[in-house]
Amino acid sequence: MSFRPSQRAQRIEPFYVMEMAKHAAAMQTQGGPPMIRLNIGEPDFTAPLLVREAAERAIREGRTQYTHACGLPELRERISGWYASRFGVSVPASRIIVTAGASAALQLACLALLDEGDEVLMPDPCYPCNRQFVAAAGARAVLLPASAQARFQLDAQHVQAAWGARTRGVLLASPSNPTGTSIAADELARLHAAVQGREGFTLVDEIYLGLSFDAAYGQSALRLSPDIISINSFSKYFCMTGWRLGWMVVPPRMAQLVEQLAQHLYILLIKYLLQL
């Protein structure tokens, strides 16, 4: 049987980190030389005992059925409380969507915000998967060279100069992978104001925010505006990379739209893990 791959699928580039991990695992399976694997960004220890015991208990008690497409209400409330206690930010649980890792959150955001031919401004260098999520939605990532002097982040001037007729928003990470740098709150506020002036969206990947130990950079973008979309994950904060648990915080008017997408795309998420 022959078939024609979609142009969208052919536009997607391999994730070379995972390709390297696959080949390294094959070498080990085939009795290759000992190696220290530095290819994947994850802790070398597993989730805390408390987490593992909670998952085992949920399985024993048969709590393995479908849940709400946005995640367990109790979990969303706990995440809301976490924002209040850690960052002093009020984030209603109704704005929190639990996802199959941060990657699923980014995919949902791109599908909710982008149409074929749209463009998204991103700093270069940036996390390579992010531009693939944009491409999978039929849009195009416009990479803007960012200098060390600018902490490898975009600023309002970048946005104003590069904004075009098909530009829909800005996607950045703070702290950034691979550079490790963050954008200062005042600079992000100016950038977001520039984006709002163009009626666009500001999407901030914050999965490494727990590794920011400087008060000037360790604050969530959600402190600045309820219109900012934030992506986060249990992977780095709680050593749960393989569990595929993440979440996104969206503006109130966007919550129902994302929920409808999640109902179709992620109803088979392993929901018992959300009972932790």
Regions found by a protein language model. Give the residues of each.
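N-terminal small-domain helix-loop-helix segment of the aminotransferase-like
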Residues: 2-101, 108
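Conserved core segment of the aminotransferase class I/II
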Residues: 224-276
